[in-house]
C-alpha cells in the first residue's frame, strides 16, 4: 500500500474536497493523510521574526522527515512541472511525505533534506494549496494506473 502524508503548519485541515480525494485515492491502494501541526512556539515565533518562524516550522517537521520516504517540500521557487512530471516524481515510491510551511517558508537547511516542488507560480492559501495538492496526487495516481480520470 502506498501512503502519502501532507504535513502543514496550520491550525486545521479543510474541507470536503480533501475527503473526496482521500476516498478516491483508496482505489489505487493509496492512503492520503493530512496532518496539521501548529506548535505553541510557532505563533510566537511568527510575531518575532521570519528566521524564528522558519526555525519553528523546521522543528515541527523534522520528526516526520523519513530517510526511507520520498520527502517533498512545497516551495514557490522550486522546480515545477505538469501533472505528468508530478506523477513521474511520485512513481515507484510507497511512502511520500509532503511539507507545507507557514507564511515565512522553509529554512534552507530543512530544504536540503527534501526534494522541493512548486505547485504554481501563484501563491495559494494553505487551504487551497492542500486541495490542489490532494487533487494532483489523485491525478498522478490516475496517470500512473492509466485511469480515465486524467484525459
Swiss-Prot record:
Reaction(s) catalysed by this chain, per the record, are: pseudouridine(1915) in 23S rRNA + S-adenosyl-L-methionine = N(3)-methylpseudouridine(1915) in 23S rRNA + S-adenosyl-L-homocysteine + H(+)
Task: Name the enzyme's class.
Answer: transferase
Q: Which GO terms describe its molecular function?
A: rRNA (pseudouridine-N3-)-methyltransferase activity
Query: Which residues does the annotation say bind S-adenosyl-L-methionine?
Result: 101, 119-124
Against InterPro entries, the record matches this protein to: Alpha/beta_knot_MTases, RlmH-like, tRNA_m1G_MTases_N
Which UniProt keywords are listed?
A: Cytoplasm, Methyltransferase, rRNA processing, S-adenosyl-L-methionine, Transferase
Q: What is its EC number?
A: 2.1.1.177
For this chain, the family text in UniProt reads: Belongs to the RNA methyltransferase RlmH family.
The record's note on quaternary structure and interaction partners says:
Homodimer.
Q: What is this protein called?
A: Ribosomal RNA large subunit methyltransferase H
Organism for this UniProt entry = Helicobacter pylori (strain G27)
Amino acid at each position: 500500500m502506498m501512503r502519502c502524508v501532507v504535513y502543514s503548519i496550520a491550525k486545521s485541515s479543510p474541507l470536503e474536497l480533501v475527503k473526496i480525494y482521500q476516498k478516491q485515492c483508496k482505489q489505487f491502494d493509496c492512503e492520503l493523510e493530512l496532518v496539521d501541526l501548529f506548535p505553541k512556539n510557532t505563533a510566537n515565533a511568527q510575531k518575532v521574526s521570519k528566521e524564528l518562524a522558519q526555525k519553528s516550522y523546521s522543528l515541527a517537521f523534522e520528526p516526520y522527515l523519513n530517510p526511507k520516504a520520498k520527502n517533498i517540500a512545497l516551495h514557490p521557487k522550486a522546480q515545477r512541472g505538469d501533472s505528468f512530471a508530478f506523477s513521474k516524481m511520485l512513481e515507484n515510491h510507497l511512502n511520500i511525505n509532503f511539507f507545507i510551511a507557514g507564511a515565512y517558508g522553509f529554512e534552507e537547511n530543512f530544504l536540503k533534506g527534501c526534494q522541493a516542488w512548486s505547485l504554481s507560480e501563484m501563491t495559494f492559501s494553505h487551504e487551497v494549496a492542500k486541495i490542489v495538492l490532494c487533487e494532483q496526487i489523485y491525478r498522478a495516481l490516475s496517470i500512473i494506473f492509466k485511469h480515465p480520470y486524467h484525459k
